[in-house]
Amino acid sequence: MARIAGVDLPRDKRVEIALTYLYGIGLSRSKEILANTGVNPDTRVKDLSDEDALALRSYIEANYQIEGDLRRWETMNIKRLVDIGTYRGRRHRQGLPVRGQRTRTNARTRRGRRLTVAGKKKAPSKK
């Protein structure tokens, strides 16, 4: 089983797809990595030679920020925005959409579940 950046790649998948299990590598970046290292994209992970696995590992570590480093970098960027008090930082802190989307309706993913507010109760009528 190939292990890159602390992640075990699934053995029965094609290398092209298996690389996308790494945080920070999607399909297009995976194809680019395979083209630059000369590894056949149709090879299954279990059929990778040790040289191919080593070539993939060294190329990825040398050229890309993935997994924990990338997550840390993103967190630090958001923290920087919050610390300097930018509009984007305030939106992150408030848990609202950051990129100008509307919030009167929608934005449920960012704002969380809907909180129902109880309506005004009717006073019992006097008879």
Curated annotation (Swiss-Prot):
Pfam family, one: Ribosomal_S13
Superkingdom, natural source: Bacteria
Record keywords: Ribonucleoprotein, Ribosomal protein, RNA-binding, rRNA-binding, tRNA-binding
Alphabetized PROSITE patterns for the sequence: RIBOSOMAL_S13_1, RIBOSOMAL_S13_2
Biological processes, Gene Ontology terms: translation
Gene Ontology MF terms: rRNA binding; structural constituent of ribosome; tRNA binding
Keyword Ribonucleoprotein: yes
GO annotations of cellular component type: cytosol; small ribosomal subunit
Disordered, as annotated region: 92-127
InterPro entries: Rbsml_uS13_C, Ribosomal_uS13, Ribosomal_uS13-like_H2TH, Ribosomal_uS13_bac-type, Ribosomal_uS13_CS
Oligomer and partners: Part of the 30S ribosomal subunit. Forms a loose heterodimer with protein S19. Forms two bridges to the 50S subunit in the 70S ribosome.
Protein name according to UniProt: Small ribosomal subunit protein uS13
Organism, as annotated: Gloeothece citriformis (strain PCC 7424)
Gene name as annotated: rpsM
